[in-house]
Amino acid sequence: VDAEIFDRLVFWIYTKSVKYRLIKDVEIIPPSKETQTKFDEEVMKLMKLWVLGDKLLMPKLQNQVMIVIIKMWELGKCHLESTSWISYIWDQTMVGSPIRRFVRAHVIYCTRKTHCFQHSGDLPQDLLMDMLFRAQETEKILGKRDTRWLWNAQQIESDWKVPEH
């Protein structure tokens, strides 16, 4: 665990709030390369904090981290340009993990098709198969526009929340 992620864990233990960096100018379309890079880096740090919470069996931390990640995506116009966070999640979590479900849904509904093609070699094989099956099921029922709307409507806490019992 790198020092900054450990520092964020200690901060959460004492304050019960997730430390994160607000990225300036995320609402500008398209975001600058610098803004995009900062956004990618901050989301990766939050993903690492979620994984640390998973390893330490800290579901409240994991759930608060997910709330912050979702807020960052809702506030900004950035899309994750890097794909390293996806492989990181797949390498560090188990099949069926709540964060894997979140990542799968994000890639299906929010990632541009050209970006997926460009980086398909970076995506875990089981993610690609799962995405294919989910997307086919959804697209058969709805068109593209309604599918995007559905993603936004379906972002409910129960999809990614870790049970706290």
Segments (PLM) and residue ranges:
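Canonical BTB/POZ domain core
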Residues: V1-Q64, I70-L75
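BTB/POZ (also called T1 in voltage-gated K+ channels) oligomerization domain detector
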Residues: V1-I29, Q136-K140, K144-H165
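Alpha-helical protein-protein interaction/assembly modules
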Residues: F39-K45, P59-E164
